[in-house]
Amino acid sequence: MRLILLGAPGAGKGTQAKFICEKFGIPQISTGDMLRAAVKAGTPLGVEAKKVMDAGGLVSDDIIIGLVKDRLKEDDCKNGYLFDGFPRTIPQAEAMKEAGVAIDYVLEIDVPFDAIIERMSGRRVHVASGRTYHVKYNPPKTEGVDDETGEALIQRDDDKEETVKKRLDVYSQQTRPLVDYYSEWAAKGDASAKVAPPQYRKILGVGNVDEITARVFEALK
């Protein structure tokens, strides 16, 4: 089972990725984790990436693809892998295809933007304990304070409505086009590709976690 999980920020990809990896016994491949590991280990690609990052630049797709290919050679990937947060752009998807990285499924978790905004902007956190609440779905007993300590809850900057909207705008411009890219490749194929086209699946990411997980597993049958 080799797959890419697509969906907007706040669509619940992280939660479902965990369930998928547990069910199929595959690792979750995060480019951020790979970069940190390569830099720490001092591999040739890690050294190259560190130079770029130290200079405040963005690590090139060539370096990222090199890291991906190295990571997929490791033993834990022999039964498959799940890409988390990669590819983010069409050039990265093209580079993966060109490098012969095989994908069985591309799974999109589709959640309307207004539902994501409500889901994320309603979160409240007790900083000291990490306990989380939601003003609508999981409210504290007393508005604005932690159930156990009575201390104030905060809304993280990342969860503020204007921040969420900005992240969704970036997703719409950069990552949303991947939905069309992969669905078209799945439907029409690509004779020049080094790997077979993936199957494209889209599920609704609205409802409780168990309902969404059931849809995910049904889509991956």
Swiss-Prot record:
It is found in: Cytoplasm. It catalyses: AMP + ATP = 2 ADP. Its EC number is 2.7.4.3. GO terms for cellular component: cytoplasm. It is an enzyme of class 2 (transferase). GO terms for molecular function: adenylate kinase activity; ATP binding. CDD domains: ADK. Gene3D superfamilies: P-loop containing nucleotide triphosphate hydrolases. ATP binds at G10, A11, G12, K13, G14, T15, R123, T132, Y133, G207. Residues 122-159 are annotated as: LID. It comes from the Bacteria. Signal peptide: none annotated. Consists of three domains, a large central CORE domain and two small peripheral domains, NMPbind and LID, which undergo movements during catalysis. The LID domain closes over the site of phosphoryl transfer upon ATP binding. Assembling and dissambling the active center during each catalytic cycle provides an effective means to prevent ATP hydrolysis. Belongs to the adenylate kinase family. This is Adenylate kinase. The gene is adk.
